[in-house]
């Protein structure tokens, strides 16, 4: 992040954490250093971060409709797909980190701030409308995406926000950062 010169490092770091939170919501298991984009306009000599780049590993792309139906019919399978996998491609100590555990741990203040920024902007009604209006989706796919995104929002992001708000109440004068720094 510090090595590139096109985008101010603090802006890039904030964007990284915003995307991390969105990836947690959309179950992206493959966000790594090779799939970020910077839009460069050589004529104007400008550069900006691509708002969306390489999200092909979101929303269980290899899950067939029969598997989706099986997941929706088994609460323990829904919970496994929320709490056990997918994991982030980001590694800590040689292991991929768990989105729910990392977010709820509050161990990175940049992540905490992104959680606040992004959670405030998530409009589930608009997301569900988008899913309903997406052409080509089968009813089971619509149900699966709607249920899984809502469950991840409630059990990952909303739970993380509850933890963060409690921590901020206990320590109103400063960050609640508890440890790990990825940058």
Which residues make up each language-model segment?
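Conserved kinase catalytic-core segment
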Residues: 1-64
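C-terminal catalytic region of ATP-dependent kinase domains
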Residues: 41-183
């Amino acid at each position: 992040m510090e090595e590139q010169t096109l985008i101010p490092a603090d802006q890039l770091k904030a964007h990284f954490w915003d995307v991390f939170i969105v990836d947690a919501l959309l179950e992206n298991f493959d966000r790594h250093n090779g799939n970020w984009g910077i839009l460069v306009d050589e004529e104007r000599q400008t550069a900006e971060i691509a708002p969306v780049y390489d999200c092909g590993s979101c929303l269980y792309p290899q899950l067939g409709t029969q598997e989706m139906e099986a997941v929706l019919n088994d609460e323990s399978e829904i919970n496994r797909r929320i709490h056990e996998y997918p994991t982030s491609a980001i590694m800590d100590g040689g292991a991929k980190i768990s989105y729910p555990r990392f977010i709820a741990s509050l161990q990175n203040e940049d992540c905490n701030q992104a959680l606040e920024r992004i959670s405030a902007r998530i409009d589930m009604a608009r997301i569900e409308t988008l899913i309903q209006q997406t052409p080509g989706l089968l009813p089971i796919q619509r149900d699966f995406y709607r249920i899984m995104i809502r469950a991840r929002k409630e059990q990952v992001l909303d739970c993380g926000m509850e933890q963060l708000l409690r921590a901020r109440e206990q320590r109103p004068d400063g960050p609640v950062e508890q440890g790990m720094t990825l940058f």
